[in-house]
Amino acid sequence: MKKVLFGLFALSTVAMAAETNLYLRAGADLNGEYDVINYEGTKVNKDEADDFSWEIAVEATREIYLKVELGLGLAYQKHGDAKSAFNHEVYGENEWDDTTLEMAGYTSIPLYIVAKYNFDAINNFVPYIKANLGYSFNDGDGDFKMSGLSEDGTLEGEVKGNVKIDDGLYYGIGAGFEYNNFTMDLMYQVNEAEAEVTVSELDVKTKKDYDYSRVTLSFGYKFNF
């Protein structure tokens, strides 16, 4: 909550200035991918995101030079969980065959600088390019789970592990257009993170990169103040 309040305070400071553009955006990820976590040769997850991923954002900018806007942005980004990894053999006190490994996804709240360049209008359409750079505050959405199946397909056992997601860099680059204050753009975005997975029952602890990257299609509206 403190992170959100700090971001809103920073945005409001920019928005109170004269000749400010305030953008509200909502978007959906087209092809989300996670870094694959490997532990001693075993893949904990697949790289594809399994669930629908979306975001909402607010950005306040000012024109600092002809056609050039600079400002701050704050977003709430709900990343889908990574797809489960299957068919591993795990040996320990217990033994599972055809093991399913489930790795939790995470939610990000990035606070970032946004830079935007507007090209000349074409029939009321204003093409633009933009770039974001900031810091992503990340929060894990669940536990690590490992479950095994017996030969007849019944659940034989399940082990859960704690997942801690560290914060990291956020950046994005893309292009779009504005028409009568409505906007549409495509952005390639990356939230950097590290995941620390602890499975006390198996005496396992590992920390690996767990970045989330994707192309996001967004629609929005610009308010002029």
Predicted regions and their residues:
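Outer-membrane beta-barrel channels and translocator barrels
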Residues: A18-T20, E63-K67, D120-N124, Y179-F182, ...
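Short glycine/proline- and aromatic-enriched beta-strand/turn motifs that initiate or cap beta-hairpins
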Residues: A17-R62, G140, R214-T216, K222-N224
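Membrane-embedded beta-strand positions of outer-membrane beta-barrel proteins
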Residues: L22-A26, L70-L74, I113-A115, I129-L133, ...
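Transmembrane beta-strands of outer-membrane beta-barrel pores
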Residues: A26-Y34, L74-G80, T107-I109, F119, ...
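Predominantly the C-terminal beta-signal and adjacent terminal strand-loop region
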Residues: E33-I37, H79-K83, Y171-F225
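Residues that define the transmembrane beta-barrel architecture of outer-membrane proteins
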Residues: D50-I56, G105-L111, F125, I165-Y171, ...
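Cleavable N-terminal export/targeting peptides
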Residues: M1-N21, F225
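Outer-membrane beta-barrel translocator domains and adjoining extracellular loop/strand segments
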Residues: Y34-K43, A82-E95, D139-E156, E194-V204
